[in-house]
Amino acid sequence: MPAVKMGVMLKGEGPGPLPPLLQQYVELRDRYPDYLLLFQVGDFYECFGEDAERLARALGLVLTHKTSKDFTTPMAGIPIRAFDAYAERLLRMGFGLAVADQVEPAEEAEGLVRREVTQLLTPGTLTQEALLPREANYLAAIATGDGWGLAFLDVSTGEFKATLLKSKSALYDELFRHRPAEVLLAPELRENEAFVAQFRKRFPVMLSEAPFDPEGEAPLALSRARGALLAYARATQGGALSVRPFRLYDPGAIVRLPEASLKALEVFEPLRGQDTLFGVLDETRTAPGRRLLQAWLRHPLLERGPLEARLDRVERFVREGALREGVRRLLFRLADLERLATRLELSRASPRDLAALRRRSLEILPELEGLLGEEVGLPDLSGLLEELRAALVEDPPLKVSEGGVIREGYDPDLDALRRAHADPVAYFLDLEVREKESTGIPTLKVGYNAVFGYYLEVTRPYYEKVPQEYRPVQTLKDRQRYTLPEMKERERELYRLEALIKRREEEVFIALRERARKEGEALREAARILAELDVYAALAEVAVRHGYTRPRFGERLRIRAGRHPVVRRRTAFVPNDLEMAHELVRVTGPNMAGKSTFLRQTALIALLAQIGSFVPAEEAELPLFDGIYTRIGASDDLAGGKSTFMVEMEEVALVLKEATERSLVLLDEVGRGTSSLDGVAIATALAEALHERRCYTLFATHYFELTALALPRLKNLHVAAKEEEGGLVFYHQVLPGPASKSYGVEVAEMAGLPKEVVERARALLSAMAARREGALEEVLERLLALDPDRLTPLEALRFLHELKALALGLPLGSMKG
């Protein structure tokens, strides 16, 4: 259940017992102690006692009081008409909501109106369209045992899957990839304060409690997570659950994209600014298409066959512009068929849902088939379409209880009741005309209210003309209201027929909804096909609009005129080439020249290719990578007590642990978080290790010592820059060979450092360079003068220490011991 504990329910003042309304409230509240109970009273959902105080604080409401003869308690409420907006805010704050509705009309109640909890709402178990985000809305469960068991369920679509992971870092990567709205933790994790604290810092989502099988009874972590997930979801849905076939998935079967890579590449969330890769690609026209595109970005493919099939479909839409525009125009009219099918299977679809199914789904399918041909593979739903056309009015109300849902001529019994109902209605319309004529009262009129029912109303000047058979029911300031025995008889008949019409219309609607529910599998299949069409057309639209090309797959990585798909939207962009094969490519150049952008652009082109998208380049051939690993940009974990350097080393350790010769590795300025000597040593050792592993590695660095590194599969590139009269000019071109210098002082000057500081830095740099050059010359002279055959081992060791001290600019003798 939700982890927001509600505690003591009701407090108040007064000597007497609770009034009946509050007794009913407390009884319902006791059944759902972990939820905030929203209790319908007329046109409002009310809370009382401490719940009222919580509601008022959370939403900024005015706190009032419920007062009876002997009792007073705090009260706060929200109007039912604004429920969706308030509920969304409460769910975002971590509240679970129990919604108690009046389940009988007030006029039919014998005493207190009966109320029941009709909905349990938590962030991860929503099916209501108004409350759901456009993205997938996952509920997750985590358990331990023979590993880390992780299960996901999207209640709104029925997607249900799970995996078994071997490490906590892999668990966090999967959670970051899926971004669940709510997480269930097994008891052994819930009771681990350190784990919970770390988890909350990384994932600000609702943590809820649910019954898990004990570890001893169900040692398999995956089974425990899966079972708890289903039990919790069923409890919130009143036992009804629509779940697609369970899928056991293996993260190793897709391209490995650790959390650090998703963040550094800004796939879903920007590090700065507003743009993301998903934002660039999201030209989808439907909600299921948008969710599918996100899923593709979370799960890039490893196999060439499925990728070529996707690219073929994208290419068709690229080549056939009129077809692409026509399909996208039709897709834009579609409802969220995937979630609508779930509401149908849960028997929660409203009249408007069925109208949307007819008008914004089924009526569009024949038009799509007309454009694409029968090979699109859409199921035949023409029978259901004709049924909905015959049964539903054009624009039905939200609730069937409001009436006017079923079209005239569809159900003979309902038609007969409506005709019978027309007689008493006509009677009251005729009554006003007849009574005006018979009494001579020109202002007489027939009215209705909920207290007195139908009445005859006469204004004060005509009181003397009122016939004796009129029975007074209400006196107002300037008018009186009356009734007649025959009016009451007709009124009772009218109420009886209205109740029969309401009941029959509900029966017909439920049967119609059941007819649609039986097509659930076909509707889900149609939703899947339409979502794929949407993504293919969207990727084609992006490709045409931005000049992307179809990638080829091979052993070499060869990109001609590659561009960064996100940066180029904000500024003029200089395209660059890259060619490598199982090599270590060292990229040097000054800050701000574009090294990091070049690294990111390469990774993004690879990622796009492996979801089946065209890529931002004039030509691209890429290997099928099994993982994309990045160490780009500075970050720290202050809450976890980790420095930038520590976080950097953890990410590098993951690369060394997982990367293979089929991996793409991007490293930017590794080692800069520590001393220069340590940094050079770490960067050199890392470069050697990755070179030995034969990864496709791009290694951006300021350490010019690394340009002397002699490895057989190493090549140097640099980002061009040149000093001109106006200062340093960045060309953003990637050229062969190492950079000639780092231009650090020039960049500092561009950043606005005071002139005297810049001049002092230049002087110090010149002095240090001269000193180092002199030291190196002295080292060389001493080596040339050395006769190694005349050195004892101790003298040789002392000589090496002296050479090292000279190279580092230290006084001789400082390296002893």
Swiss-Prot record:
The UniProt record lists the keyword DNA repair: yes
Gene Ontology biological-process entries: mismatch repair
Pfam families listed in its UniProt record: MutS_I (PF01624), MutS_II (PF05188), MutS_III (PF05192), MutS_IV (PF05190), MutS_V (PF00488)
Single Gene Ontology MF annotation: ATP-dependent DNA damage sensor activity
UniProt KW keywords: ATP-binding, DNA damage, DNA repair, DNA-binding, Nucleotide-binding
Residues binding ATP, per UniProt: 589-596
Entry's transmembrane regions: none
Record's keyword annotation contains Nucleus: no
Domain of life according to the entry: Bacteria
SMART domains with a match to the protein in the record: MUTSac, MUTSd
Function: This protein is involved in the repair of mismatches in DNA. It is possible that it carries out the mismatch recognition step. This protein has a weak ATPase activity.
UniProt similarity note: Belongs to the DNA mismatch repair MutS family.
Protein name, as recorded: DNA mismatch repair protein MutS
Provenance organism: Thermus caldophilus
Phylogenetic lineage: Bacteria, Thermotogati, Deinococcota, Deinococci, Thermales
